[in-house]
């Protein structure tokens, strides 16, 4: 998921020769036993653009990270103790993480529009229940890297991010790819925000299918899910 985490010391690694577009992230740990409880997390899809434009911010995690090192993600992270419960906690974490990772200060939780909710597959050791929010870039603000967890950032259209991934210029993981594929269907920030405000968000929990040395991620409705 787009939330940060550390690989556990125990548990076998998921096969590393999975197809990049639909495989688990390198370093994720396969959990052969009972599913672990997902940690609550939040992520922000920061948007900019005019009436006929839509760009979004991706940040690159430091290659030194043991989990998803060097991967480009939407800014985000785990909910901290003291940030409340439920939607309030997810919104507070989203605002905080965007400020910490990209130096963008939103006016407050009301600046966020709920877009999606993804839960890490039960077959993976480290799990997150991540709530994704949309937010417009505030006036007179520009993102900046924190120099720690985040080492690079850039603006992409959804299509250009997917092309950069296919060309091997940036590394993306499954949830980010699937979000970009959906976002590519919108031509402007306003169109996307209008859609999201009316959307009934339902949780998406993929499954990992192990086929010998190859792992694939399946979504609800896929054959074999």
Residue ranges and their predicted role:
Residues 1-150, 154-225:
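N-terminal leader/linker segments that precede catalytic domains of diphosphate-processing enzymes
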């Amino acid at each position: 998921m787009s939330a940060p985490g550390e690989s556990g010391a125990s548990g076998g690694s998921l096969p590393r020769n999975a197809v990049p577009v639909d495989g688990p992230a390198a370093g994720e740990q396969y959990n052969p036993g009972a599913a672990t409880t997902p940690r609550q997390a939040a992520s922000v899809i920061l948007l900019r653009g005019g009436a006929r434009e839509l760009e979004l911010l991706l940040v690159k995690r430091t290659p030194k990270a043991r989990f998803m090192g060097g991967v480009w993600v939407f800014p985000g992270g785990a909910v901290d103790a003291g940030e409340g419960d439920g939607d309030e906690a997810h919104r507070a974490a989203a605002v905080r993480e965007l400020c910490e990772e990209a130096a963008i200060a939103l006016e407050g939780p009301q600046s966020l529009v709920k877009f999606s909710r993804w839960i890490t597959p039960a077959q993976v050791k480290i799990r997150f229940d991540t709530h994704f929010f949309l937010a417009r870039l505030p006036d007179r603000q520009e993102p900046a890297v924190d120099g720690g967890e985040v080492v690079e950032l850039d603006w992409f259209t959804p299509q250009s991010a997917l092309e950069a991934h296919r060309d091997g210029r940036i590394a993306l993981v499954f949830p980010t790819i699937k979000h970009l594929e959906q976002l590519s269907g919108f031509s402007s920030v306003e169109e996307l925000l209008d859609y999201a405000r009316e959307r009934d968000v339902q949780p998406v929990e993929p499954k990992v299918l192990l086929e010998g040395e190859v792992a694939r991620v399946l979504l609800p409705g896929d054959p074999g899910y």
